[in-house]
Every structure is written in C-alpha cells, then in structure tokens.
Amino acid sequence: MLLRSERLRLIGKVDEVRKEGDAAIAVQKKTGRAPRQGVWPQHRVQMGAYLLLLEELHPGTEPEGVIRYARAERRVTLNPFLRYEVLETRDRALQVLQQRTLPPRIDDEKRCRACSLFSLCYDDNKMRELGYG
C-alpha cells in the first residue's frame, strides 16, 4: 500500500495496513534474519516513516508497526525518539538531494548488495553521467 504525505515530505510502500480497534497497523515483511533484540536500525527508521504517514492519514488512530522477519516478528512503536530520528533522516536525505552531493560510498560491496541503489553506486560511469565524481 502506497502511503504519501506532502506535508511530511515522505512517501513509502508498506506491505500491509490493517485496522484493529483504534490502531492502524503497518506490516512490513523482511526476508532476512532478525537481530537478537529489537529490529535492525534501518528497518526501525523505515517503519517509523510508515507510522508517521499512518498517523497523518488516519487521524485519531494509534499507529503501530510489525516487522516480520523470516523467523521472528517484532513490534515497533512510534515514540518521540523515533519521530525525531525519522524526520532527521528525511532532512539529511533532502539535503543530499538538494546539494547533489552523495555521502561517501562504503567500500564493502557485500554489505551493499541488498540495497536497491547498489547497481547505481557501483557503476562509476553512471555516477559520472549523473554529475557525481
């Protein structure tokens, strides 16, 4: 389900949204393993963005998040710290886009392979074509 807010300057595609009482629950499925505790940091921020979007799109509901890993299910709750982290991450991303400067590339292709931008970051010709490097 596509979630979008011009005011928040956020957009995201969550796997599922369901209503349970006063709660709007975002469900995101991940194929990898779960960390020993909680959720991976990037998954927490991603889910936090979905929760901010749900909060705006469904006023009066309590947004909740569930991340389903291959063998575990973890809950994510929107709190002031996560709200700040999501908005700070959004602001940094907008700044990168406005300045047309990219953060330094991590020289660990194995770590990056799951990223949707992997082929772009590791294609030096494409990066030059876009005006980076």
Say what each PLM segment does.
Residues 112-115, 121:
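Short cysteine clusters
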Residues 55, 98, 120:
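Hydrophobic/aromatic-lined pockets within catalytic cores
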